[in-house]
Amino acid sequence: MKKQGVLHRDLAALIASLGHRDAIVVADSGLPVPPGVNCIDLAVTKGIPPLLPVLQVILYEMVVERVVIADELQVNQSLVKSIADEVTPVSLEVVSHEQLKSLSQRARAVIRTGEWTPYANVILYSGVAF
């Protein structure tokens, strides 16, 4: 039994299976999951779990080379700053929400949280550890 890091079986398996430049989306509770894209649904109720702690645990185990958020999220500078702080030294790439939804069609999975903040979605692209 694992004692730290990602304990959710499906999420741990997803992270372990990622190859270079594979994408996953850590999403709020409202992002539509594209047909054919796996959804790992962590949402329990409104706000639980929030996006940021889920992102932190994923980043503990995942090498990330690119991060994308929606321009519309920038109205919530507190959350944007928290996300930017977590993914440093990688910078945030900002696209429209429509572009983010389009990019999510090529993701390996959408990890749905209980986050109740509009546009609180983050696409993580896998890097390499060497």
From Swiss-Prot:
Q: Which GO terms describe its biological process?
A: D-ribose catabolic process
The record lists substrate as bound by D28, H97, Y119, A120, N121
What family is this?
Belongs to the RbsD / FucU family. RbsD subfamily.
Which protein, by its recorded name, is this?
A: D-ribose pyranase
Write out the entry's keywords from A to Z: Carbohydrate metabolism, Cytoplasm, Isomerase
Q: Which superkingdom?
A: Bacteria
| SUPFAM superfamilies named in the record | RbsD-like (SSF102546)
- Its biological purpose: Catalyzes the interconversion of beta-pyran and beta-furan forms of D-ribose.
Where is the protein found, in the record's own terms? Cytoplasm
Pfam family example for this protein?
Answer: RbsD_FucU
Q: Which organism is it from?
A: Desulforamulus reducens (strain ATCC BAA-1160 / DSM 100696 / MI-1)
Q: Which residues form the active site?
A: H20 (proton donor)
Gene Ontology cellular component?
A: cytosol
Q: Which reaction is the catalytic activity of this chain?
A: beta-D-ribopyranose = beta-D-ribofuranose
